[in-house]
Amino acid sequence: MGKSITTEIEQGIGSEVDHFVYRVPKKNHDLTMQLCKEFGEIIRSYGVVHLVFRLNNTEAPMEGITNIAKTISATQDEEVWLELIFYRDHKHKDEVGVKMRNDERMGPLWQRSMELVTQGTGFIMGEFSRLKV
């Protein structure tokens, strides 16, 4: 991958990212897809990049590596999901946070999300800043 392509990708995703890892019962897959679509449409209107992933397998590829499904105690009846929200910079992240808190649609979406994740669990969240390496 050339430097110009890498730079273009990096500029497109910004320098700040929030990640959310959570377990969803397989029976809630379609409802969670719909919820992520609704949330994504709203949050993209705030100018962020929102990506959603589902874990493909639960096998560790080699000794010394633990699959995330094991780390968060996912069962065979559950899927492991990952959501990433990219912001241009910390100021943009703060601005989006204010918009989310003031958006009346967010409360019901949050409530629905808590009903869809595995009972007794929630979201594992991390806020990251990109390192320039």
Where are these regions (language model features)?
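Glycine-rich beta-strand-turn "strand-cap" elements at beta-sheet edges
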Residues: 1-13, 44-76, 101-133
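Surface-exposed interaction/gating patches
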Residues: 7-35, 39-42, 46
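Generic intrinsically disordered, low-complexity segments enriched for polar/acidic and small residues
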Residues: 17-19, 36, 84, 120, ...
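Short, well-ordered beta-strand segments in beta-rich or mixed alpha/beta enzyme
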Residues: 17-24, 63-101
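Residue-level signal for secondary-structure boundary sites
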Residues: 28, 91-93, 133
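Short amphipathic alpha-helices in soluble, non-transmembrane regions
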Residues: 33-39, 96-104
